[in-house]
Amino acid sequence: MKLTKTSRPTTPQPGLISTWLLRPLLLLLAIALLYQSWFLLHIIYWRTYHPTTSAFMQDRLETMHRQNPAAKLQHRWVDYEQISNHLKRAVIATEDARFMQHQGFDYKAIEVAWKKNLKQRKLAAGGSTISQQLAKNLFLSSEKTVWRKLQETLITLILEEFLSKRRILEIYLNVIEWGEGVFGIEAAARHYFGIPASSLAPEQSAWLASIISNPRFYDTHRQSPRLLKKARIILSRLPTAKIP
């Protein structure tokens, strides 16, 4: 009787398993680095050149086009020196009082916002700095996801590393929304007061800064008691606001 050899199941060698796991991880890492470099290159470019649009501007324009295909945004870039210092102080006073001190993240504001959210049991306050808001406006969608928040954090770090505080504030004032289809402080000053951004008085600046939180609503509710009260508070804080 002839004995036959029974074949034993082969087990993958440890080195082969490591290779199988390592390759997809390296590929994912390469894709992530390539994706981040896209943001980095844009930000380095904007050290010298002005952004002509933003992700948020494009999103708003698409929304407007669904209602009116001929709709256009009001937007005109204006250099830092041509923006009223009153307006700069007003925006910092209301949006990011420690703008000149932090490196992109105001941990005190985040703590206050977190406690407020816990008290109200909802996401009512965010504690985002001007740099964080700029990261969202320039590159990101309005989705509220963990991935988007992580991406916002990375972009904020890049902004703070490669742009000066002065440049961050200049771009911010030129790209944020100030009303229905109104983007940038020059368009806002002309839309609401019929004057250039360089001529904004303290009272006008405080009022404009107070509408940043909900610009489209306040575009049609300009005499809202809540808005006017907020503007008076901002006006009282102008002398202590520090600008680049």
Curated annotation (Swiss-Prot):
Q: Which UniProt keywords apply?
A: Cell inner membrane, Cell membrane, Cell shape, Cell wall biogenesis/degradation, Glycosyltransferase, Membrane, Peptidoglycan synthesis, Transferase, Transmembrane, Transmembrane helix
Q: Which GO terms describe its cellular component?
A: peptidoglycan-based cell wall; plasma membrane
Bilayer-spanning residue ranges: 25-45
Q: Which Pfam families match?
A: Transgly
Q: Report the SS bond pairs.
A: none
What are its GO biological-process terms? cell wall organization; peptidoglycan biosynthetic process; regulation of cell shape
Q: In which pathway does it act?
A: Cell wall biogenesis; peptidoglycan biosynthesis
Where can this protein be found? Cell inner membrane
Instruction: Give me the reactions it catalyses.
Output: [GlcNAc-(1->4)-Mur2Ac(oyl-L-Ala-gamma-D-Glu-L-Lys-D-Ala-D-Ala)](n)-di-trans,octa-cis-undecaprenyl diphosphate + beta-D-GlcNAc-(1->4)-Mur2Ac(oyl-L-Ala-gamma-D-Glu-L-Lys-D-Ala-D-Ala)-di-trans,octa-cis-undecaprenyl diphosphate = [GlcNAc-(1->4)-Mur2Ac(oyl-L-Ala-gamma-D-Glu-L-Lys-D-Ala-D-Ala)](n+1)-di-trans,octa-cis-undecaprenyl diphosphate + di-trans,octa-cis-undecaprenyl diphosphate + H(+)
User: Which EC number(s) does the record attach to this protein?
Assistant: 2.4.99.28
Q: Which GO terms describe its molecular function?
A: pentosyltransferase activity; peptidoglycan glycosyltransferase activity
Root EC class: transferase
| Membrane topology note | Single-pass membrane protein
Provide the function of this protein: Peptidoglycan polymerase that catalyzes glycan chain elongation from lipid-linked precursors.
State the family it belongs to: Belongs to the glycosyltransferase 51 family.
Q: Which HAMAP family match?
A: PGT_MtgA
Tell me the protein's name: Biosynthetic peptidoglycan transglycosylase
Primary gene name: mtgA
